[in-house]
Amino acid sequence: MEVKDLKVSIAPQEVLELVWQQINNAISAQFLDKYIQETEQGVVAMGLFEKYYMRSSNRATLTVLATDFDGVTRVHLAAGGGGQGAIFRFDWGAGEDFVELAEDALRQYMLE
């Protein structure tokens, strides 16, 4: 499992759109689900993506959670499910690659 936290200068909904544009270039990618909740405190946007990785002979998932409760959009990226076997969950770098795809999509908007 690979996890990364970022701060970006765009709205949570835009985060999901940009990540999907980046991931959609892969033939085996899917946008499985999206949930957006707008409140008085801010916006929560969650996206669930899936992609097949030949190196691990498995599908990996990427969960993207973006919030803007304090005036800055915070993004949490978590990839998993790409491992082989019941005991060892070694994914041959698929999770890291999936998180990096999302990070690349947001790079020009990153803060700090």
Regions from the PLM with identified roles:
Residues 1-27, 31:
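Terminal, regulation- and interaction-focused segments at domain boundaries
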Residues 2, 12, 22-23, 42-44, ...:
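N-terminal catalytic or cofactor-binding beta/alpha core of small enzyme domains
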Residues 10, 14, 59, 93, ...:
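Conserved active-site and cofactor/substrate-binding residues in soluble primary-metabolism enzymes
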Residues 16-20, 64, 103:
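A generic alpha-helix structural signal
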Residues 20-62:
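Ser/Thr-rich, low-complexity intrinsically disordered terminal regions
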Residues 25, 36-37, 68, 107-112:
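N-terminal intrinsically disordered, cationic/polar leader segments
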Residues 56-90:
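Beta-strand/loop substructures that line and gate deep hydrophobic ligand-binding cavities in soluble
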Residues 96-112:
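Well-ordered alpha/beta subsegment
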